[in-house]
């Protein structure tokens, strides 16, 4: 049975110019739906976003992707410079990108990041769209399609990861 109080993290290992194939490494994933209702934000919610490191240019490039998703959901992303925030974005060079899923972001201590975008200003727009839009969708509450319990695909996770 899923532990509804535990925040979920979606993590993708960064392999330039490849699509995300990583999955939530979580034994509870079978109980989740693509957009898990328990992790979706309340409708019309203001979701505060803070950049905890990175350059001004990285902030602009990332914020552009938050605004793009903002157009399609009935949520509003609000940038904050200081104080508490719902989503805390880092640009750490971890060779991975990840985000907590939906309101799971609020379970993370304020001194910890909830999203990592290992992107640089010299990465092209296609890469910024591919990675940042993907992670912002996780922050909204969406999971990967292959994690839907009714996908009917018998995944061999080890083979997929080793591919």
Regions found by a protein language model. Give the residues of each.
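Zinc-dependent metalloendopeptidases
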Residues: 1-163
């Amino acid at each position: 049975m899923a532990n509804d109080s535990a925040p979920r993290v979606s993590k993708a290992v960064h392999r330039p110019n490849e699509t995300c194939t990583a999955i939530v490494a979580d034994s509870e994933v079978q109980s989740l739906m693509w957009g898990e209702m328990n992790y979706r934000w309340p409708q019309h919610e203001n979701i505060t976003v803070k950049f905890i490191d990175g350059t001004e240019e990285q902030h602009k490039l990332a914020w552009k992707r938050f605004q793009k998703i903002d157009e399609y959901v009935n949520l509003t992303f609000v940038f904050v410079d200081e104080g508490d925030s719902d989503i805390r974005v880092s640009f750490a060079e971890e060779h991975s990108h990840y985000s907590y899923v939906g309101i799971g972001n609020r379970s993370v201590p304020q001194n910890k990041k909830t999203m990592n975008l290992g992107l640089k200003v010299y990465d092209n727009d296609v890469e910024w769209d591919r990675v940042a839009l993907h992670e912002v969708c996780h922050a909204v509450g969406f999971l990967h399609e292959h994690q839907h319990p009714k996908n009917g695909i018998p995944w061999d996770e080890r083979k997929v990861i080793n591919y």
